[in-house]
């Protein structure tokens, strides 16, 4: 499963691009350069990662209200666990489920079923919130989960999308009840 070996996949993509250039008559480029480009892209991606604005506050408010919370994420165990720590998420969730630690991930049904079972909730009691239409909307909806798509950049659904999220938000704070004054 390539999403558990992203660095290797990036090297292969760069090497493939170099091969295409060479086949088109361009001077061959070194594999060392492919490795360095792949490494730099990985570092760049890491630098660009962020917690959605308002996420910590919203998650903390849900937890304070007694909502059971699971973080379900794909990827290799080491890098994902490092992100959980980097973004101070561990204490905020009742269950953290990383694909590389469990051997399955989204959009596999058992990823959602395992999280629900661990929390002791049913599909009708569950909300799935995320920015990936396939993994956090389509697949959960098949199980009867209320699927919320977070459109953090405000781009809206792709024009050709047939996906219909149960709700679209720009920030997790939109899910909190309004403050009473």
Report residues per predicted region.
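Short helix-to-loop capping/linker segments positioned immediately adjacent to catalytic or ligand/cofactor-binding
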Residues: 25, 48-49
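Asp-based, Mg2+/Mn2+-dependent phosphohydrolase catalytic module
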Residues: 32, 56, 60-63, 67-181
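Short C-terminal alpha-helical element
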Residues: 35-39, 52, 130
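Short alpha-helical segments used as structural interaction elements across diverse proteins
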Residues: 7, 42, 77-80
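A metal-dependent, Asp-based hydrolase signature
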Residues: 1-40
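Surface-exposed cleft-lining segments at the edges of enzyme active sites
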Residues: 41-48
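Conserved phosphate-coordination/catalytic loops
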Residues: 8, 49-53, 105-106
